A protein has these predicted regions:
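The feature marks cytosolic C-terminal regulatory regions of anion transporters and related permeases
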Residues: 1-99, 117-120
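Short acidic-hydrophobic, aromatic-tinged amphipathic segments that line or gate anion-handling sites
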Residues: 99-115
């Protein structure tokens, strides 16, 4: 969206990174879509932008954990951007924040892009 100052089209994404944005709540009915994200060998960082995810249930968290494991096996660091309050609370309760590493959970897309640059 050209009116969005945080549009990824206006950002410089490092060559080693790719960005996926998830929109809407992640519940069991839509959560498996996370596993549809293709992992490409040319990237060593995948930024999952979650600014529009207002809620996350246990099933979605399970799929997110599976996706994290797939990334790990391919040597890709998963970085989360703009995780809202309820999803963050669910992640903390399940220990996902510790699993992924708190340094890989960023408040803003700019922070996530800077984290990707650190991981070149």
């Amino acid at each position: 969206d050209e009116n969005d100052p945080d549009s990824i089209d206006l950002k410089q994404v490092p060559n080693n990174a790719t960005v996926y944005e998830i929109s809407g709540p992640l519940f069991f009915g839509a959560a498996d879509k996370i596993l549809d994200i293709k992992l490409k060998e040319k990237y060593n960082v995948l930024i999952l932008r979650m600014r529009s995810v207002t809620a996350l249930d246990a099933t979605a968290l399970h799929f997110l954990e599976q996706f994290y494991e797939r990334c790990q096996k391919k040597g890709i660091t998963l970085v989360l951007s703009h995780v809202n309050e309820q999803p963050m609370n669910a992640m903390k309760k399940a220990g996902f924040d510790t699993l992924i590493g708190e340094e890989n959970i960023c408040l803003h897309i700019d922070d996530a892009l800077n984290r990707a640059k650190e991981l070149v």
